[in-house]
Amino acid sequence: MQLEFLGTGAGSPSKQRNVASVALRLLEERNAIWLFDVGEATQHQILNTTIRPRKIEKIFITHLHGDHIFGLPGLLSSRSFQGGTEPLTIYGPVGIKRYVQTSLQVSESRLSYPLHFVEITDDGELFNDHGFRVIARKLDHKIACFGYRIEEADHPGELQVEKLREQKVPSGPIYGQLKAGKTVTLPDGRVLDGHDFIGTPQPGRIIAILGDTRQTKNAILLAQNADVLVHESTFAKDETKMAHNYYHSTSKQAAEIAKKAGVKKLLLNHISARYTGKAAYQLAYQVRNIIPDTRVVNDFDVIDIPFKK
């Protein structure tokens, strides 16, 4: 599981940063890519990665400001042109369906795959297939805006092979049955419960990806005990008033949310073009006294999300 940042800038593209988009790479987990926001030129950014558009299974839009959606029609068309046939689902605020359908109709674009929409009106669960669960909550922005919490299901514990060998259990199909938690009767009459030979389950990973927002309780709820929080940092830590007026956050406010939520790693994105070079990295440096594992992400950064130790 990895996060790959395709655009980390705020408002409009700059030479250093494209506008908002981040890919959650779930190739090992479900052979799929999930995108969060699709700013202008996202498909061009993808050309500089190993992402294949036909692998994109779901797209989650935080809100309908242009820097988060202007790349969507082009990406959808290219996915079709490149041979995509698998269904794709777009989640987002009310209006996302009309925006996409109008863009495709006016441009007379035809897609080679089924396109589904889930328009969000309130907080709640969007998706749950027992492998992953996605929850959306409203944030505090100028227009309807949502954050997303992605929860991976716990992984079953490992089969304790040494314990089986100690009890002289013959290897073979029996091991598979025990690993599945089944009760097995051996040729010598012994009855074994598979649960007695399975280790502690591996907790699933949790990621929170937020859209543009002021500080809000829902941000804490979304990020509660997350392994990674992706939070906007449009303004530096001392620009609290400006952040409030523009419905955005400072780096310090993002770190405070992470601290209250018990987050392990904070990734700051949605960086204003006013912060370049060292000034951008200062956004993270200034708040590491709150969350030590904080970094400002750049376009094309890839962040591994390991299992909890």
UniProtKB/Swiss-Prot annotation:
Cofactor note: Binds 2 Zn(2+) ions.
Binding site for Zn(2+) 2: D67, H68, D212, H270
Alphabetical UniProt keywords: Endonuclease, Hydrolase, Metal-binding, Nuclease, tRNA processing, Zinc
Entry EC no(s): 3.1.26.11
Annotated GO MF terms: 3'-tRNA processing endoribonuclease activity; zinc ion binding
Cofactor(s) needed for function: Zn(2+)
Residues reported to bind Zn(2+) 1: H63, H65, H141, D212
PANTHER family: ZINC PHOSPHODIESTERASE ELAC PROTEIN 1 (PTHR46018:SF2)
Function in brief: Zinc phosphodiesterase, which displays some tRNA 3'-processing endonuclease activity. Probably involved in tRNA maturation, by removing a 3'-trailer from precursor tRNA.
Similarity comment: family membership: Belongs to the RNase Z family.
Assembly and interaction partners: Homodimer.
Protein name: Ribonuclease Z
